[in-house]
Amino acid sequence: LNVMMKNKNILVFILLCVFSTVTYAKKGKVEKEISDREYWAQMAYKIAAPVLSNMSKGELKKNMQVEISPTWDGRSKDVTYMECFGRLMSGIAPWLSLPDDDTEEGKMRRQLREWALKSYAHAVNPDSPDYLLWRNEGQPLVDAAYIASSFLRAKKQLWEPLDEVTKQRYIKEFQLLRRIDPPYTNWLLFSAMIESFLMEADAQYDLFRIHTAVRKAEEWYVGDGWYSDGETFAFDYYNSYVIQPMFVQVMQTVNDHKVILHDRSLEMQKKTEDLAKKRMQRFGMILERFISPEASFPVFGRSMTYRLGVFQPLSMLCWKDMLPKELPEGQVRNALTCVMKRLFAVDGNFNEKGFLQLGFAGHQTGLADWYSNNGSMLFFGCSSCCSAALFSATSF
């Protein structure tokens, strides 16, 4: 009997070892690690594909499930589609600027770029079902600026391939937005961004709108890397969403074209650009320090549902190789990756058709402001992916 019990115990032990080995092997196979870069590329594609695959066929308005804030102010819901497209393209333009290759990432980029070029044409074609809301409301000034930003960020890949009719339609729509008198807030930079792109496109531009935005941004600097949004400081993340990235982008464009603003010299303007970059570096350091060891960060102020848009300046510093020496590249990459994984691991960020939903971590409609819709979320879901525009061989 003792021999039988001993043999039985040996058999159970062997079976447990075999079962554990098989289970471990299966688990290892399922949970294969992917690189940070692969994760970023997959997330960018996941966010962008539902929008561009539909809009490339003129079917975005038909198939997008529009979601507005519970406190919506009553403006036309059609602003959603322009917000969706403009913010998305500004966010992924740096990544789409990379050359084609035969990697899985390269195939995703190529597909998105092909869809994007067709979508750009639909956006300004009055005969298309997806012609955007250019000529009503004031909101189009905002999202036209993001479209202009996408062209500046990837001119060779996204602007130059467009046919001449489409280019002229954009120039006309951009110029017609001068009907909107922007308030003395970050909105001045939207006007300046559009006029800067018209300068880049060798079209007629309004230098006064650029100069006004530059002058006011300089006046609104309050110290330690922060600008106020107008005369009164607001403790929110609009330095990330708009002010810092657009101010730098506008100054770079003006200086690249050697256009002199009123009562200035090119040397003075270059100092303004350099100072804006230094301030963005300081602000980037603050943003990086906001990220806790658990990959959380403080959420405050309006537009909390813009998610990763908080880190646009930090990602832009990576993309442009402008990180201050105090911020090692690997540290920033790891911090941003961990934040992305924590945010998007929560259920409810996407609806059943794959579009982003209102919320911060998951589906949280109560966080949305009176002007927010799920189109507003798109750019800010992708904006921290600017760094993915770096070649895989770079040290970042």
Language-model segments: what does each one mean?
Residues 26-83, 90, 94, 114-119:
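Low-complexity, Ser/Thr/Pro/Gly-enriched N-terminal "stalk/linker" regions
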Residues 104-105:
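Long, charge-dense tracts
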Residues 70-75, 101, 129-133, 231, ...:
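Glycine- and acidic
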Residues 306, 316-396:
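Extended polysaccharide-engagement surfaces of secreted carbohydrate-active enzymes
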Residues 284:
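Glycine-rich phosphate/ribose-binding loops and adjacent secondary-structure elements
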Residues 81, 92-95, 109-280, 289-315, ...:
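Aromatic-lined, polymer-binding surfaces characteristic
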Residues 1-29:
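Bacterial Sec-dependent N-terminal signal peptides
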